[in-house]
Amino acid sequence: MRKSKRERQRLLQETIQENPFITDEELAEKFSVSVQTIRLDRLELSIPELRERIKHVAQQSLADKVRSLPIEEVIGEIIDIEPDHSAISIFDVKSEHVFKRNRIARGHHLFAQANSLAVAVINDELALTAKANIRFTRQVKENERVVAKAKVVGEKENGRTIVEVNSYVGQELVFSGTFEMYRSNREKKDGDSNENSN
């Protein structure tokens, strides 16, 4: 038996709240309506499409892991992070990121993606870049996707954490950098190293 539009929309909302990863096709089958009807219902209820729902759930999860800066201040979109070990972000180069005359990305956007990822990977309330050694290895053009990969590689005697960031378009390296990071809270790390040395 077909449900009224109001009843279907109420159930649709409940179903998506229970399982934000359900597709429009699965919803259409569940409610015996067309995919287009589901899309119209979602629009009326201001429920985003599956991709946006997945992104929202992932960002909420990542926001809990990133302590050093608000997730919305990260340049690019963090897709994976293991605090004090590694992180990955993606950055889609759009028209506002390139020089108008040649459609090449401005370098400060690539640096900002790498630098903010180096900050985000630090598991501390405050992390600042003390020093950076960077290299641009090829031009990045409009509509290319830059994948930045950060890895914590060590710690200096002065307590600063060393983070290496390599950025790629496809398999091609386009940017590399070594970031020396100041962090405000050294007690935990110092305690860990003392335990390991005993």
Curated annotation (Swiss-Prot):
Q: Keyword set for this entry?
A: DNA-binding, Fatty acid biosynthesis, Fatty acid metabolism, Lipid biosynthesis, Lipid metabolism, Repressor, Transcription, Transcription regulation
Q: Does the keyword Lipid metabolism apply?
A: yes
Protein's GO biological process: fatty acid biosynthetic process; negative regulation of DNA-templated transcription; negative regulation of fatty acid biosynthetic process
Which SUPFAM superfamilies does this one have?
Thioesterase/thiol ester dehydrase-isomerase, Winged helix' DNA-binding domain
In this chain the MaoC-like domain maps to 102-169
GO MF terms here are: DNA binding; DNA-binding transcription factor activity
Q: Coiled-coil segments, which residues?
A: none
For this chain, the family text in UniProt reads: Belongs to the FapR family.
Q: Which HAMAP family does this entry report, sorted A to Z?
A: Transcrip_fact_FapR
Main role?
Transcriptional factor involved in regulation of membrane lipid biosynthesis by repressing genes involved in fatty acid and phospholipid metabolism.
Mind telling me what this protein is named? Transcription factor FapR
Organism classification: Bacteria, Bacillati, Bacillota, Bacilli, Bacillales
